[in-house]
């Protein structure tokens, strides 16, 4: 069993055990990849609706992309309960921002940096929020897309992906993304990435949502499925090249 | 104002609903040397009269940079002003650090006002004895605010505080309607002319005033002596009715010694009219 020795008053071993159990050690219910791109009018973000419990695809109706304030979208992979906690923090933040009622509002850049501070500080206390977050938004005509990991690594880019998306989707995006994609082309590109993830990521399910954010606001699509093709000839006799295997 | 039995504590109301200690704090602001602020849609200019304790000492700093997009000019107890400037810098930098974005000046002045209000409601504290002219930017452009020891704050197109500020205010009242659309250069000129009003007879020299500017796409900075003198030269050449005869000719540096009577600026401000701010 791996334990960290947290240097506190050594006389009370019961208290040490309690403190250990308060920290996040491993995730339980997790979401898989998020893929997001900047396009002509703003940002598009795609995710499936699955929540895995280890290797079981247990929950199939989890929204992993949410609108934040007027100008931003937040997508998360990793521990779902930590994502809900983050949504509560952001709720408080945007509420206080609205209460000022002074014509100033938090844009995607501010929220991204706030989240970076939160994630990094939690990591420093050895109690991370077990998520990789994607923050996209539009404010005053400028699109913004950034990412924060559970250890506080944070950056901006024209296209981002989390988890398996980094390995399977980013190469496609590096080849095929270009500035000023139309909405239709953007969706097609995201669907291409999501299809590859569906085929190859074991924790992906075939029920996805694509969210769009523009200067006008946020729209999250209804859940839908991708068409898949399983009739490849090699699937008919998969062991043709290696007799005896399964 | 005269002494009365309700003015010992800040936590004592008078029967007419006044807090005298707070009002006395506002008097302290009127004793400080003048500070002036003006703003246009995109720029804010803060200017002040340099006052020195004696001829031997250097003058006190009255304008502080809070951030690239916020500056503050103070009048009154400069020690209180220094402490509050440090608070403002701290708030500003903490916001920048967390959000990577400049703190909107409107929110900063509310924090400042709330801080001042606390001192009007604790028996073991005293109100800050300094008035602050805060100029800064937020999403909707340039703003100028005045923060009072009472914990109130107001937004202004142009304002002046400190001794003989009424003269400057009279000048500003005549011209403020044009400020919103003014160019930066005109705004600076108006600020220096307003400073001249508070000097009431003393020759206006660049060594007597400090001027600072900030704007959209222009971080807070001070104007150097040369630039100020250049602006002074543009209007000191034109003799106006208010000016004393014999002053204000076309000399680039004002003649020393011939500055006339009333040379001292700082001490003995009993001639300050008890005006309402």
Swiss-Prot record, chain B:
Modification N-acetylmethionine occurs at: 1
Ranges of biased composition (kind: Acidic residues): 239-252
Cross-link Glycyl lysine isopeptide (Lys-Gly) (interchain with G-Cter in ubiquitin) per UniProt, renumbered positions: 51
GO term, biological process aspect, one: ubiquitin-dependent protein catabolic process
Keywords: Acetylation, Cytoplasm, Isopeptide bond, Nucleus, Proteasome, Ubl conjugation
Signal sequence, start to end: none
Alphabetical list of InterPro entries matching this protein: Ntn_hydrolases_N (IPR029055), Proteasome_alpha (IPR050115), Proteasome_alpha-type (IPR023332), Proteasome_alpha1 (IPR035144), Proteasome_asu_N (IPR000426), Proteasome_sua/b (IPR001353)
Disruption of the gene: reported phenotype: Do not show arsenic tolerance phenotype.
Cell location: Cytoplasm; Nucleus
Biased composition (Gly residues): 259-268
Cited Pfam families: Proteasome, Proteasome_A_N
Region entry Disordered, spans: 237-277
Gene3D superfamilies: Glutamine Phosphoribosylpyrophosphate, subunit 1, domain 1
A Gene Ontology term for the protein's cellular component: proteasome complex
PANTHER family cross-referenced by the UniProt entry: PROTEASOME SUBUNIT ALPHA/BETA (PTHR11599)
Quaternary structure and interacting proteins, as annotated: Component of the 20S core complex of the 26S proteasome. The 26S proteasome is composed of a core protease (CP), known as the 20S proteasome, capped at one or both ends by the 19S regulatory particle (RP/PA700). The 20S proteasome core is composed of 28 subunits that are arranged in four stacked rings, resulting in a barrel-shaped structure. The two end rings are each formed by seven alpha subunits, and the two central rings are each formed by seven beta subunits. The catalytic chamber with the active sites is on the inside of the barrel.
Known function: The proteasome is a multicatalytic proteinase complex which is characterized by its ability to cleave peptides with Arg, Phe, Tyr, Leu, and Glu adjacent to the leaving group at neutral or slightly basic pH. The proteasome has an ATP-dependent proteolytic activity. May play a role in thiol biosynthesis and arsenic tolerance in association with PAF1/ARS5.
Family: Belongs to the peptidase T1A family.
Protein name per Swiss-Prot or TrEMBL: Proteasome subunit alpha type-1-B
Species name: Arabidopsis thaliana (Mouse-ear cress)
